[in-house]
Amino acid sequence: MTEAWTQAVRSQLDLGRLLPLGGPHDGTWITEQAAVQALGRTAAEIPGVRLESLRIGSAPLQPVSEPAVRPPASALPPGSLTIEAAFTASLVRPLPETADELRSTLLGAATERLGLATVTADLRVTDLREVPEAGVTPRTAETAMRPTPEAAAARNSPPVTGTGSMRGLVRELADVAAGVPGVARLTAVLGSRPVRVEDHDDPPGRHIEVHLAVGPGHHPLKVARAVREAVAEAATTHTPGPATVAVLITETAAWRQTSPVTVLSTPQ
């Protein structure tokens, strides 16, 4: 039991923080690991830059909002986010110029390509090099936050819809979510099924939480919005109250092919 508990804790740490996507009414979160991997890939394209670490969290002293739906356990509330990055740079170009490009790249990609409400990027230079390193794979938080083999296997497995214990309503909603364009597959993280359904009586209603991966060519926030709409509509069957849906994105391959999306920091 102790080993299983330790493994569960490690898997949770691998995911990092659960970051809000969009605004309070979007009901969507993304794992810090997925966001960091995406930002690390685009930062690697900046000449002379090698990321050493990259973290994303709530911006200090900034207001937060109450989400419109129940968030995943331990998820950050909707609000402004900040990026913290440590990097090494080449002296081939002026350091301020390199830092400005890295900052604008990280902020722009986080906001436009992912849907994160990032407002600042704090950078720290850890080393300066005379010449650019050749043939070296950029070291980013993608490697620093690499999942354990067991966690990776769970997140890389095929969709579990229609198999095992996925029965009845849960199976139906899983099929609905998996069928939304842009959903690469449903994922099992945080020690739970890809789709969780909970009915409550006071007030009457139903809450669904969906964990998924976003495929290439699709914007994470747009996909999540479509999933929430489709699942909420399907989940109203045989329930006396409304259905609310929260989405957690655990992986995204949506990079360089997606179009920007509007991120709302206040309710619509």
Model feature map: region roles:
Residues 113, 117-184:
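Surface-exposed beta-loop interaction hotspot
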Residues 1-26, 72, 135-160, 252-268:
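Actinobacteria-biased recognition of intrinsically disordered, low-complexity terminal regions
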